[in-house]
């Protein structure tokens, strides 16, 4: 079966593993998925990101992060721009997620970055997802 939205699949796999309190989640790799995973790592939402070569496209192994009493660090993931309805925002219209507590991941002409980085660089782009 052909996957129509690989980014939504990635977010759903992370969301499901997080809700089931799994330690790791494995996702088929791509450049965009790796960039999103690296942002989640840099922003402190996940513990580690590892790329495994399986002879095909590769696999991203994401180690999820939990608090001392197994409380979830990621409380929500939401896909915004979908293949059927793309969502774009100018640099001055970039959304603030939960008043700055969460992040929006934006695909800009300079690569994939958070809403804060895009605002600072004065770049707009496609709003991929929200993480809080």
UniProtKB/Swiss-Prot annotation:
Domain of life: Bacteria
InterPro entries linked: Ribosomal_uS8, Ribosomal_uS8_CS, Ribosomal_uS8_sf
Keyword Protein biosynthesis in annotation: no
Keywords in alphabetical order: Ribonucleoprotein, Ribosomal protein, RNA-binding, rRNA-binding
Pfam family, one: Ribosomal_S8
GO cellular component: ribonucleoprotein complex; ribosome
Keyword Ribonucleoprotein: yes
One of the record's GO molecular function terms: rRNA binding
Gene Ontology biological process: translation
Assembly behavior: Part of the 30S ribosomal subunit. Contacts proteins S5 and S12.
Family (UniProt): Belongs to the universal ribosomal protein uS8 family.
Stated role: One of the primary rRNA binding proteins, it binds directly to 16S rRNA central domain where it helps coordinate assembly of the platform of the 30S subunit.
Full protein name: Small ribosomal subunit protein uS8
The organism of origin for this protein: Caldanaerobacter subterraneus subsp. tengcongensis (strain DSM 15242 / JCM 11007 / NBRC 100824 / MB4)
């Amino acid at each position: 079966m052909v996957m129509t939205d690989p980014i939504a699949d990635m977010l759903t796999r992370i969301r499901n593993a997080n809700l089931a309190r799994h330690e790791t989640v494995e996702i088929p790799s791509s450049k965009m998925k790796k960039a999103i995973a690296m942002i989640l790592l840099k922003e402190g939402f996940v513990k580690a990101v590892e790329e495994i070569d399986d002879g095909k496209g590769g696999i991203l192994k994401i180690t999820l992060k939990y608090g001392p009493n197994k409380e979830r660090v990621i409380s929500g993931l939401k896909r915004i721009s979908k293949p059927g309805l793309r969502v774009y925002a100018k640099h001055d219209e970039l959304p603030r997620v939960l008043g700055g507590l969460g992040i929006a991941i934006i695909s800009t002409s300079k690569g994939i970055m958070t809403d804060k980085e895009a605002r600072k660089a004065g770049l707009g782009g496609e709003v991929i997802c929200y993480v809080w």
